[in-house]
């Protein structure tokens, strides 16, 4: 999924938090950063003024403005031209410092957004860097029901009619929490972290065949819904009639594997859907088993080791 952010969107999203004022270059509100547009030669999306390897959002603190003031007229104008020529998304001045008139004029002439904030430079840097990195991070929408089960994020997947929503409803009645139904969005916010959220349109809603759309918050209370959760496990529901009979080894270890999501391999456990099986209990057990495995505890491996030791002792 391609993502981008314009200068206007960034300003509106951070205006209240950073008390931003737009003082010049208002016509540049449509300047845009696209996901994946950064390259190895650029230090970061947002950073202190860097003329050699410019950031997309250039922050001018006390030292940066003092450095500009220390230049002679020719050097100062050449430096301002370099800042403007690379077309940054925006320039941001910290601590409500006065904006130099030549910088303001250059920003207006080139339609370069110029903002002023009462926040200190490092506060601007931290907020803008985090917000841009999260907004432009790789993201994908997966079909399924995303829930918090025993404090970890579990995505329930399967074919249409496999019982995902009914399973989610049963898990909700057992005290677990819903993050998103049908189309959870996952963002890779770190090399090994996928953060799952719910689209605004589907917030708090769960669709169950025969019942229609249910408002989980109204039915089960505020504690039954969760704003976001890191994806740690996928439970896939499958119809065994179309699958081969599990081998003896699979009967010991279960049908487990992984699914590639963005740049990560997420652990996956497959549960056959058959009459009489309590899928809610099985899903809870699968989640507990995953938690044990992350701690290095594997019951199947323990059994195989015991069996091997027993055979060795009985071998003459």
UniProtKB/Swiss-Prot annotation:
Cofactor: Mg(2+)
UniProt entry tagged with the keyword Transferase: yes
Catalytic activity: [HPr protein]-L-serine + ATP = [HPr protein]-O-phospho-L-serine + ADP + H(+); [HPr protein]-O-phospho-L-serine + phosphate + H(+) = [HPr protein]-L-serine + diphosphate
Matching SUPFAM superfamilies: HprK N-terminal domain-like, PEP carboxykinase-like
EC numbers for this chain: 2.7.11.-, 2.7.4.-
Region (Important for the catalytic mechanism of both phosphorylation and dephosphorylation): 206-215
Coiled coil: none
Positions that bind Mg(2+): 165, 207
Pfam families assigned: Hpr_kinase_C, Hpr_kinase_N
Keyword line: ATP-binding, Kinase, Magnesium, Metal-binding, Multifunctional enzyme, Nucleotide-binding, Serine/threonine-protein kinase, Transferase
GO annotation terms (biological process): regulation of carbohydrate metabolic process
Gene Ontology CC annotations of this record: cytosol
Active site per UniProt: 143, 164, 182, 251
Class of this enzyme: transferase
HAMAP family linked to this entry: HPr_kinase (MF_01249)
General remark: Both phosphorylation and phosphorolysis are carried out by the same active site and suggest a common mechanism for both reactions.
The protein's name: HPr kinase/phosphorylase
Source organism of this protein record: Xanthomonas campestris pv. campestris (strain ATCC 33913 / DSM 3586 / NCPPB 528 / LMG 568 / P 25)
């Amino acid at each position: 999924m391609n993502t981008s952010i314009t200068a206007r969107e960034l300003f509106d999203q951070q205006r209240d938090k950073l008390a931003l004022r737009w003082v010049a270059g208002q016509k540049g509100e449509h300047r845009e950063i696209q996901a994946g547009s950064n390259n190895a030669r650029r230090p970061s999306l947002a950073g202190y003024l860097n003329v050699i390897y410019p950031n997309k959002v250039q922050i001018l603190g006390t030292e940066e403005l003092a450095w500009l003031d220390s230049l002679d007229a020719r050097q100062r104008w050449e430096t301002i031209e370099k800042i403007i020529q690379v077309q940054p998304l925006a320039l941001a001045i910290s601590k409500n410092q006065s904006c130099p008139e030549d910088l303001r004029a250059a920003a207006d002439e080139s339609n370069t957004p110029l903002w002023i904030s009462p926040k200190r430079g490092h506060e601007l840097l931290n907020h803008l860097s985090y917000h841009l990195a999260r907004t432009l991070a790789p993201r994908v929408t997966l079909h399924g029901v995303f829930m918090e089960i025993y404090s970890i994020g579990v995505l329930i997947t399967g074919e249409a009619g496999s019982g995902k929503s009914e399973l989610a409803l049963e898990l909700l009645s057992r005290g677990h929490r819903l993050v998103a139904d049908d189309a959870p969005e996952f963002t890779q916010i770190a090399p090994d972290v996928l953060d799952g959220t719910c689209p605004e349109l589907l917030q708090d809603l769960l669709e169950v065949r025969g019942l229609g759309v249910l408002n989980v918050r109204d039915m089960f209370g505020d504690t039954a819904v969760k704003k976001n959760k890191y994806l740690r496990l996928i439970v896939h529901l499958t119809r065994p009639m179309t699958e081969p009979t599990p081998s003896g080894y699979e009967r010991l270890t279960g049908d487990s594997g992984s699914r590639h999501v963005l740049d990560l391999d997420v652990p996956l456990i497959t549960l056959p859907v058959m009459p009489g099986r309590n899928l809610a209990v099985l899903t809870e057990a699968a989640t507990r088993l995953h938690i044990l495995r992350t701690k290095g505890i594997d019951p199947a491996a323990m059994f195989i080791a015991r069996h091997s030791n027993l055979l060795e002792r009985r071998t003459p």
